[in-house]
Amino acid sequence: QKIPAKQDVLGWDLSTLNADDLTFLNTLLGEGEVSVRIQQADGRASEIQESIFCGIWRVRCQNDLGQWEEHLEAGSAPRALWQAATITTLPDDSLLPPPVDGLMNGLTLAQELLAHVRDPATQPHSINLTQLPVSDADRQFLSRLCGEGRIQIRTIGYGESQIDATALRHVWHVRCLDTLKGLLLESYEICPLPELVQAAPEDLRDSLQRLDEVCGWLASGPPA
């Protein structure tokens, strides 16, 4: 009965549920549009699946022994995702890779990207490669600058979006795909967490209402 504020998360440990109860809960919650895979630096992993109730997340995390622990969370995004999104490198110009043949706007875009990463007051900021004259060399230059992060996000809806964290703090590589037309949009998003991943407050309110209806239906018992 509470809508958590942005970056606040409500959590419930599912370790006390028996196998039947856990199966029932998973069936009830289903699978929503967002799935996340996080690979920690120490080798541990987290797997996150949004439920059909937007903003309700099923989270599986490995503990220090490598065992999987499951819990349920409610919020705009799960706690593990907020935490992992900050464990990256703050850049300086020394990170710029050497220029390569075929560069058009790659160096200018790289300097723009680094400037916004260094100044959180200018975030969020988007560099939409789809709407800019960029070459394959530009894309490779930006990819080498940003490196690979430890978070992979997939969303499904009208199409599929692939959102990958880079090795730079608050820099995300976003690609929106269409099964027939291929790549629709490619961008670098500079922000703590892309809005595309987060459940909006109105989505959380809608989920609360729907869960209230489900709880009422369960409490009423089977029909006579």
Regions from the PLM with identified roles:
Residues 2-15, 50, 55, 92, ...:
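N-terminal/domain-start segments enriched in small and hydrophobic, helix-friendly residues
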Residues 15-38, 132-154:
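Extended intrinsically disordered, low-complexity coil regions enriched in Ser, Thr, Gly, Ala
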Residues 11-19, 34-58, 62, 151-181:
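Short, structured protein-protein interaction patches enriched in aromatics and acidic/basic residues
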Residues 58-87, 180-207:
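An acidic-aromatic pocket/loop used at catalytic or ligand-binding sites
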Residues 158-224:
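C-terminal structured domains
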Residues 2-9, 99-150:
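Surface-exposed interaction/gating patches
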Residues 63-126:
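Surface-exposed beta-loop interaction hotspot
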